[in-house]
Amino acid sequence: MRLPGSEKVIVGYDLGNKYAQISCYVTGSEEEIRTLSSVAGSSVYTIPLALSKRQGVNQWFYGSEAIRYAGEEEGILVENLLKLARDGEPVQIDGAPIDPVALLTLFLKRSLGLLSQVTNTERIGALMITCEELDHRMLEVLTAATEGLHLKTDQICFQSHVESFYYYNLYQPEELWRHKTILCEYGDASIRTYCMECNRHTTPVVAYMEEREFPFPVPESDEKMQEIAKKLCENQMISSVYLIGEAFSRDWMKESLR
């Protein structure tokens, strides 16, 4: 559904090391937050963090199309865009050095084109970008990359995953965070977990966040996931558990979810 009037769109952009995901909310609308499909008519919501350039021509592709084009044609594939931008070293592409932050800006610009499913980038009223860690260098990178988008809004914010999880919890019904709340994020050969717990014996109430990382060498191992779940939940009062990461959408956790 495209917007008929002048409503603004609030965009949430999760920028991972290998994938990105875009959600949006139309102000004044009764519709829920919508996550944009990266493939028209499908339920594929993750966008590979990659670009490819056609050799000898200033033609670029992004996401799954970039990977496909680089495999089928003589395209030059560039992955790990966030890491490259953070490192700051020029990237040699087709015989020329290119600013890695400019590559990240190009990826952001192309991927935000998915908003055409709802509206266009002219109507972005606010943009929130989340990433795993938000230190001084990452803040510099994201600020420079978003300035290159030339959006018609100054409401551009950045959050770490820890901050995002904290604020998300606070806006949920209290029964979902009355006791410990756990988020599990499926990453590269590891499961990163965030546990939030509130101390109600203080005024004001103080929230604590614990971050842990568990090795996960065997992909989609139900047995290993069950071990992690026991370490996190055994003898604990748990209000809610969230699972994020594309691998969790597949049907492999038979015992872990019991």
Report each predicted region and the residues it spans.
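A generic secondary-structure signal
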Residues: 110-118, 145, 168-172, 227-232
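Helical "lid/coupling" subdomains associated with nucleotide-phosphate turnover
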Residues: 217-258
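Phosphate-binding loop and its immediate beta->loop->alpha context
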Residues: 28-149
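Local beta-strand N-terminus motif with an aromatic residue
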Residues: 124, 178-179, 237-240
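Gly/Thr-rich phosphate-binding beta-strand-loop-beta motif of the actin/hexokinase/Hsp70
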Residues: 2-39, 170-211
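Conserved phosphate-binding/catalytic loops in two-lobed NTP-binding clefts
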Residues: 151-165, 254-258
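Extended hydrophobic secondary-structure segments that form protein cores and membrane-embedded regions
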Residues: 126-131, 158, 183, 240-245
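Short flexible coil/turn linkers enriched for glycine and charged/polar residues
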Residues: 16-18, 121-123, 133-136, 186-190, ...
